[in-house]
């Protein structure tokens, strides 16, 4: 079906390369890139809804820096790498893990043990395993000094757009389509990932977190630039027009 299509849409240039490598007979001129969009009227810098703060319920200290992760517990999302890196975070940094829906019992047990070890080694670890409504996720993203995306692969990484739309700096691996979302040194920090050397990635990730969170002004600049980038380049109106243009040409 893919090779017979008049047009194929990939969500990033990285995904386009992957499609062409899997389907070598596919005409490259028929493979287009249209990135996923973000609704900046849904994702925006926001205080707690109706005064009900999920962070206050968790016991997060608003006077201390905090990094957040939101995602499923899978190998692809790199949660074990983030937990390992957090052992090297500066002691004042808090970590909010909104991580649930493990895809295997094995990784569920692995992450549970790793979080327990981390919490025993240092304070400021908050693990939310249940599903949260958008309003509470928006509160967490908005309050975070930085959002951390340790994925080992992402076609694009919509969660990074959600964090950026909330005016939060992003620290992310440089895999897949992530570099097409996170502008290194402008909206966040990219960390090199090599599957053959995960320990190096974890050390680099910790160093990036410590560096950015020690400079709140830079984190704030990244966050402001990230929201503007979402508005300018990832609005659904912008994405829809790109999609329509492909249909017109076909």
Question: Over which residues does each language-model region extend?
Answer:
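Conserved donor-binding/catalytic core segment of Leloir-type glycosyltransferases
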Residues: 9, 61-77, 83-86, 96-98
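Nucleotide-activated donor-binding/catalytic signature segment of Leloir-type glycosyltransferases, i.e.
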Residues: 108-135
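A short helix/loop element that forms part of the nucleotide-sugar donor recognition site in Leloir-type
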Residues: 44-60
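Short hydrophobic beta-strand element within catalytic cores of glycosyltransferases
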Residues: 169-172, 182
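Short alpha-helical donor nucleotide-sugar binding micro-motif in glycosyltransferases
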Residues: 139-144
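Aromatic "clamp/platform" in nucleotide-sugar-dependent glycosyltransferases that forms part
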Residues: 152
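Carbohydrate-associated surface elements
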Residues: 14, 37
